[in-house]
Amino acid sequence: LLINCARGPIVDSAALAAALNEGRLAGAGVDVFNQEPPIPDSEPLLRARNALLTPHIAFASQESMIRRARIVFQNIESYLAGKPENVCQY
């Protein structure tokens, strides 16, 4: 089983699709592609067996949204208290 939710080019899509179609790999979960959105005629994973594909939304769980909101509120509170966090120096 292979899961890629990092970056599309990390995995060779054609090789992964071949491994899935030939039964050398049991399954794959893919949330990222070489081309976003994937082009149907040129993305072999769209036709591969045992591939679970999502449209680059692996980050969008309820837990991650709640955590992100908490971080935003903490950053606003810190800024208003005169103690900004994660300051970018340019």
Model-derived features: positions:
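Short glycine-centered segments of the SAM/dcSAM-binding site in methyltransferase folds
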Residues: L1
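Rossmann-like dinucleotide-binding domain for NAD(H)/NADP(H)
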Residues: C5-Y90
